[in-house]
A protein has these predicted regions:
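Short acidic, S/G/P-rich loop/turn micro-motifs used as interaction or catalytic elements
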Residues: 17, 72-74
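Auxiliary, metal-adjacent structural segments of Zn-dependent hydrolase domains
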Residues: 2-63, 125, 133-138
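Short active-site segment of divalent metal-dependent hydrolases/proteases
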Residues: 82, 86, 90
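Short histidine-centered beta-strand/loop micro-motifs
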Residues: 56-57, 69-70, 78-80
Length: 140
């Protein structure tokens, strides 16, 4: 198996996360890249409030992902990140274009993102049990 190294730029991370949470985020991104590899660099911005285009996250053109972070458990933030990562994969590897009309509820792209993000989170919890307290906000 060949692994492609991509850069993932994290924006606003210091506003919301402890060093242990950042370590978990970085481990999770490595896990995502191993399981659903992207070929192009991506930017992930953690936001304090929703913008008009997102529920808890959104994938934007030019490989940008925005994730609502404020007042959420890390496990919820990572599920959103995983969901949007799948959408980025759909654009980078499956031929989905920014101009394509995507069905926001129940469409194939959205269903794929929902299913895979749940699977990835459960596998991450299983494979990295040492991160579980961080994911669930159970730090001392």
């Amino acid at each position: 198996m060949i692994f492609i190294k991509v850069k993932v730029k994290l924006k606003n991370k210091d506003n919301y996360f402890s060093s242990k949470e950042l370590e978990t985020i970085e481990t999770f991104i490595g896990f995502l890249q191993k399981n659903l590899p992207l070929e192009k660099d991506v930017s992930v911005a953690f936001e304090k409030e929703r913008n008009k285009h997102m529920t808890t996250g959104v994938r934007l053109p030019k490989h940008h992902i925005h994730v609502l972070a404020k007042d959420r458990l890390l496990i919820d933030v990572l599920r959103t990140l995983s969901h949007e990562w799948v959408h980025e994969f759909q654009h980078q590897k499956m031929g989905v274009k920014d101009t394509d009309k995507i069905q926001p509820i129940g469409g194939p792209e959205e269903n794929m993102a929902n299913v895979l993000s749940g699977i990835f989170l459960k596998k991450f919890i299983r494979d990295f049990p040492n991160h579980q307290p961080v994911l669930f906000g159970e730090l001392d």
